[in-house]
Amino acid sequence: MLIAQRPTLTEEPISEFRSKFILEPLEPGFGYTIGNSLRRTLLSSIPGAAVTSIRIEGVEHEFTTVPGVKEDVTEIILNLKGLVVSSEHDEPVLMYLRKQGPGVVTAADIAPPAGVEVHNPEMHIATLNSKGKLEMEMTVERGRGYVSAAQNKQPGQEIGRIPIDSIYSPVMRVTYKVEATRVEQRTDFDRLILDVWTKPAIRPRDAVASAGKTLVELFGLARELNVDAEGIDMGPSPTDAALAADLALPIEDLNLTVRSYNCLKREGIHTVGELVARTEQDLLDIRNFGAKSIEEVKQKLSDMGLALKDAQGGFDPGSAAGSYGSDHDQSYVETEQY
């Protein structure tokens, strides 16, 4: 089983509703795989709430005007598409707006029921003159993505009920880029930078967490085909600080002989953590790695209180995740013979 360094995810808040998320280091190619999957999921699959239909007192359809109101019904509907709401209810709920002119009608004039919140109360809806009056009923529903007014139209819908386009997604924009990052001597690992903008209804970190949960659930279906299938094991991070430091040491610090060092490096073993994840037979299978090299490695590990995986008190790969943490770049020439 291959052991990879456990990636870390950090958040860099830019504003209340914009954050950058940095995931590194990733195996080459995984930056684009994960970045594209997260972006598409964030934009299409995060649940939210939106107005799906309205009813205005004295209005039968959207192609008309309301006496005393500057904006026609089409303009009012266009403004309502920018309303940011959240709802705790799975079923549709009603909100009401009643305003007498003169004055400006904003989202702050809406009276939402318990469990529903308007997040942009400053949003402009309409302008009333001294004789103007606006009474409106809005239906709020939960959903995902975008639903057109035609899809929101219900069979047998009452006269005066006007369906509108609904933008449920609380995520406004997502971009990502992949940079190269260095892990010891290798410079081809991926660094994923995800930039997320959200509406006031949700924080970027909560949106990313929701997208991650959705993807885990979906990819879990593939894993269930064979729970014993081999893959890259990220391994849990050791909790003991001293042990974590020992496992992160580059094998250069073991002061091995030239032959042993070069054999391990060619096999892709760069840290003590990766070394203790191998069995004695794994090492014997390495070309030019003989019994004397095995004894040398076992002695060096014993001096640190560690052992190979199959030894008494040895380590399981799941708990010995390698961590590359050195810039050592030694090029040895094999001259010693066994």
From Swiss-Prot:
GO CC terms of this entry: cytoplasm; DNA-directed RNA polymerase complex
Domain notes: The N-terminal domain is essential for RNAP assembly and basal transcription, whereas the C-terminal domain is involved in interaction with transcriptional regulators and with upstream promoter elements.
Keyword Nucleotidyltransferase: yes
Reactions catalysed according to its record: RNA(n) + a ribonucleoside 5'-triphosphate = RNA(n+1) + diphosphate
Cross-referenced HAMAP family: RNApol_bact_RpoA
Pfam families the record matches: RNA_pol_A_bac (PF01000), RNA_pol_A_CTD (PF03118), RNA_pol_L (PF01193)
GO biological process, one term: DNA-templated transcription
Highest taxon, organism lineage: Bacteria
InterPro entries: DNA-dir_RNA_pol_insert, DNA-dir_RNA_pol_RpoA/D/Rpb3, DNA-dir_RpoA, RBP11-like, RNAP_asu_C, RNApol_insert_sf
E.C. number: 2.7.7.6
Assembly with partners or alone: Homodimer. The RNAP catalytic core consists of 2 alpha, 1 beta, 1 beta' and 1 omega subunit. When a sigma factor is associated with the core the holoenzyme is formed, which can initiate transcription.
Alphabetical list of SUPFAM superfamilies matching this protein: C-terminal domain of RNA polymerase alpha subunit, Insert subdomain of RNA polymerase alpha subunit, RBP11-like subunits of RNA polymerase
Enzyme class: transferase
Region (Alpha N-terminal domain (alpha-NTD)): 1-226
Residue segments, region Alpha C-terminal domain (alpha-CTD): 241-338
Keywords, comma-separated and alphabetical: DNA-directed RNA polymerase, Nucleotidyltransferase, Transcription, Transferase
Ranges where the record places region Disordered: 317-338
Family recorded in the similarity comment: Belongs to the RNA polymerase alpha chain family.
Gene Ontology molecular function terms on file: DNA binding; DNA-directed RNA polymerase activity; protein dimerization activity
Function summary: DNA-dependent RNA polymerase catalyzes the transcription of DNA into RNA using the four ribonucleoside triphosphates as substrates.
Record's protein name: DNA-directed RNA polymerase subunit alpha
